[in-house]
Amino acid sequence: MRFTSIEAVALTAVSLASADELAYSPPYYPSPWANGQGDWAEAYQRAVDIVSQMTLAEKVNLTTGTGWELELCVGQTGGVPRLGIPGMCAQDSPLGVRDSDYNSAFPAGVNVAATWDKNLAYLRGQAMGQEFSDKGADIQLGPAAGPLGRSPDGGRNWEGFSPDPALSGVLFAETIKGIQDAGVVATAKHYIAYEQEHFRQAPEAQGYGFNITESGSANLDDKTMHELYLWPFADAIRAGAGAVMCSYNQINNSYGCQNSYTLNKLLKAELGFQGFVMSDWAAHHAGVSGALAGLDMSMPGDVDYDSGTSYWGTNLTISVLNGTVPQWRVDDMAVRIMAAYYKVGRDRLWTPPNFSSWTRDEYGFKYYYVSEGPYEKVNQFVNVQRNHSELIRRIGADSTVLLKNDGALPLTGKERLVALIGEDAGSNPYGANGCSDRGCDNGTLAMGWGSGTANFPYLVTPEQAISNEVLKNKNGVFTATDNWAIDQIEALAKTASVSLVFVNADSGEGYINVDGNLGDRRNLTLWRNGDNVIKAAASNCNNTIVIIHSVGPVLVNEWYDNPNVTAILWGGLPGQESGNSLADVLYGRVNPGAKSPFTWGKTREAYQDYLYTEPNNGNGAPQEDFVEGVFIDYRGFDKRNETPIYEFGYGLSYTTFNYSNLQVEVLSAPAYEPASGETEAAPTFGEVGNASDYLYPDGLQRITKFIYPWLNSTDLEASSGDASYGQDASDYLPEGATDGSAQPILPAGGGAGGNPRLYDELIRVSVTIKNTGKVAGDEVPQLYVSLGGPNEPKIVLRQFERITLQPSKETQWSTTLTRRDLANWNVETQDWEITSYPKMVFAGSSSRKLPLRASLPTVH
């Protein structure tokens, strides 16, 4: 079954088309132009002032990458040297500077989610931003809230935060603030509904033997889009994100980087996005269509990697000269790019890139792939780590979730013989960076694989850190790190005072195949014989502690309730300080306060199967129908009355907490008013000129395959090299696509993140929390709301806070619920509304431990 339209879903019921119909994404034109609203005003005006001085070719130069593997960064635009504007360096990844050296390898986004700590999210973002800035990168290609985590086995879930949109949204926003406060443009990605690696790109899928010709299509209804997948991006826009990266997949059978509904309507018109939309690498599929649908920057610039051809560059210049793309659209692209640059203060901090993404050699050709240009110093080996190892270690410890503890932890340091068991305890025999883009599972797992990685400056393994602890106390430590040497594992476990067993499960981006996992995991089991390693140790040692390093949930049902398994910890993907972070928790220097950012089911079937791994549409685009709507992770478990092993939000401590005294207070707030009125007409800046103004400059030494904005000839058809050049634009351009007249403001729009009235605080909720144990510890009070409708989740997370309490001390935690927190999306009015269904609020320590509840008063 396939959805007929993103708007064709009633508020309380999904309307499905017949099986032979494909989902359809309705057109929305024209592409909204930036207006500098809110705190963008100063940056917008500066951008207008500089863009007004640019020629058409100079504007185009800002919009188009110069080509894959040509300049130093993984993506680099042209600049405007005449006006002192450099080409902009865009660099991966969401957890650190990729393809570089002397940089930090931070914990992954999923670990930040496990901290439930807004301040740590900000500090991590700020620290990463500092390192990107110091390396000469202007744009960080992160953070990610797409994938959100529709399927627990989605390959890149770990790059983002959590399948809960509220938790993801808050930490997404804080990360963006941190990055941009360090003077680097943050890129909110991957927009949108990019939830699996299978079929994300047709050429990649063809390489794996799948006979498809188009990327897979994520098919979802408007309610699901707004209440789940768009939610964290609204938080990102409200936080001032300078860039948004559109994704590889199609959304309702329209590619993410030329989908006018998701880019023009949702992102720019409804959420009021003022920055620029950048394509993911090779996700740009059409020149004019992409420009008019809201794409602002093409990366890495070429049609295919290293092809030397581009949908934009020269072709965008031609499209403006012949009137196919209006001047106001390319002006808007340039203004958006420059406004983001100015908003973060990049002009004050700019430094040229001091590293090469393509080689670690000190010297090389300036234009790497074609071995052209001067032979010069391309790597300056600048150490940008500062003191970030301290923060990384803290986040690693504060994100370690204690899932089970039968009195085994914390360790006392007096254990006479400690057994370290499992490959995940030790080093990769090829070195921490021995597998390209971490594309293997050898040794301890501290990040997944793909473009969302960074080189480790070092990696402290659990074996190193724990051995240091044991030897410091003059006790014995022995290792068994061959996961198939079961006899040796059993023999060692028999002699141990405590057996620490290390297991893992990996995943990553689809261009790398690890043990038959094409990015997405094939299943949720532990890798490399992990279950048998645990059972071998536990059958011979009555004090077996299991440590899991994984990209998400794994199946623990075979051994979690074994009485000899006395403790279980999830360490996630903790980055370079992995072993030290874990030792801090094991030995009680840090009291665990982390909470699971996802649900641990008893079986893979408990999650339902949302991952499409076989083509289902002939050789056309595989159709990925999001038939579950908003019911993913704990929402789906609740709906199906499925009992998890460990619920969303669950996590133990070395102390205990008590919740009491829930109070609810209605706050004074303005009435909700749908936004109304019209925009100004699209402004233009400067003159376009004639084709003769944009011929290649005399004396230019052209670089092979480099993407330029200039023309070979004043004959535009000859300059384009397009066999279909001259086709009447009215034959293929949607109605209104080039209309620069004033446009109506959407009811749900009018401000950053949507209608400003959505963020009015309507209700204050307070709870008393007491530390009833004997040691200080962190707790994360969680506030859930029931929206009351018959087809709504039983509860949805809305607020949380990580707090520290000394023993026997208590505090009153107070938070507020906004209009958005209490509203549903109405597909008929195309606006948010607080329904008349009775609503309740719940408070507690996890999604299934909510001792306090109260009815909410009626608000509007």
From Swiss-Prot:
Its EC number is 3.2.1.21. The active site is at D280. SUPFAM superfamilies: (Trans)glycosidases (SSF51445), Beta-D-glucan exohydrolase, C-terminal domain (SSF52279). Glycans are attached at N61, N211, N252, N315, N322, N354, N387, N442, N523, N542, N564, N658, N690, N712. Pathway: Glycan metabolism; cellulose degradation. It catalyses: Hydrolysis of terminal, non-reducing beta-D-glucosyl residues with release of beta-D-glucose. One of its GO terms (cellular component) is extracellular region. The keyword Coiled coil does not apply. Beta-glucosidases are one of a number of cellulolytic enzymes involved in the degradation of cellulosic biomass. Catalyzes the last step releasing glucose from the inhibitory cellobiose. This is Probable beta-glucosidase A. It comes from Aspergillus niger (strain ATCC MYA-4892 / CBS 513.88 / FGSC A1513). The lineage of its organism: Eukaryota, Fungi, Dikarya, Ascomycota, Pezizomycotina. The gene is bglA.
